[in-house]
Amino acid sequence: MKIATINVNGIREAVGRGFLDWLANQDADVVCVQNIKAKSFELDDSILYPEGYEGYFLDAEQDGFSGVGLYCRKIPKAIMYGLGFPQCDHEGRFLQADYDRFSIAS
C-alpha cells in the first residue's frame, strides 16, 4: 500500500499549479491533504472526486482556513470527522479513514 501526504496551502491554488496531475502520478492508495482552505461544497467534482479516487473532507468553520482531506482508491469501512471535541474540531484538522486492518488520518 502506498500512502502520500501533502500540504496544499489552498486546494484551488494547488489545482492551478498541477495538483491533480501530481495526484494521478503518485499512484497512491491514499493521499492525505492538509490546509485545503476551502469549503468542500464549493469545490468542483473534479477536485472532490479525481479519477480513481473518492474524496473525503473536513472543512474549517472559518472561511479560507485550514481543513483536511483524504483521497482514497478503496472506499473505507468508516470515516471519522474530527476528534469529538468542538473546541478544536471547528478548525477542521482531523479526518480518519478506517479499513479492515488499519486506520489513516489526515
Where are these regions (language model features)?
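N-terminal, active-site-proximal structural segment of metallo-dependent hydrolase catalytic domains
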Residues: M1-P50, F65, Y81
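Structured beta-strand-rich core segments of catalytic domains in phosphoester-bond hydrolases
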Residues: K37, D45-S106
